[in-house]
Amino acid sequence: MADYQTVRTQGVAQPPAAIDEGLRAHMSKVYGTMSVGMLVTAGVSWAVGTSPALLSIFRDPVTLSPNILGWIAMFAPLIMVFAFGAAINRLSAAGAQTFFYVFAAVMGLSIAWIFAAFTGLSIAQTFLVTSIAFASLSLWGYTTKKDISGWGSFLIMGVVGLIVESIINIFLGSPAIAFAVSIIGLLIFAALTAYDTQRIKNEYVQHSHAMDQEWLDKSAIMGALSLYINFINMFMFLLQFLGNRE
């Protein structure tokens, strides 16, 4: 999604101090947008997951497995990510931000089942562990002098493999495959957190001289989306190991 728009290259070069100040503001917007998205997801998932009436809309009353609406809710976030990437050039910054928050709400709907499957305490504890791990990895990605841009292709291939294996295991129902996917997925999205943080930082440093505020605003939203997805996946994979079943 890094190539979602064409950046103007004309402009007056900014002094390092201006870049540092602008970068801090840019990263604050990225993390702020991501945090609001997390709150939206948490609110929707809690509201649906703790309401038997709402939860019953998305699962079979006898088997408790997802019904048609449940499957749609589960796959909707994945479809929306691809749609977001394809539409970002045509969206305004305000439109992109609205799309992101709608996506966060749909994501909350897709993971609402965790409140019926795991205890509230274990969900909270897993969220705390994920937050600490995410913050540490993102900080390392931001501050490291090591160029980790080469990780990108490998990690994207890993994500594609995870998606394929997860879909296959929906039909196989293999605990061994589910365990392997959780371990590998956790490692991949942990690495993506550091990688995406450095990428977001470098994109700003390389293109901030263009002074295109619309581009910077959309870049911050796309950065927030990337980090949000990493956080959600780390949380869901960790929940498989740390969550206590109801």
Regions found by a protein language model. Give the residues of each.
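A hydrophobic alpha-helical transmembrane-helix feature that marks the membrane cores
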Residues: 1-246
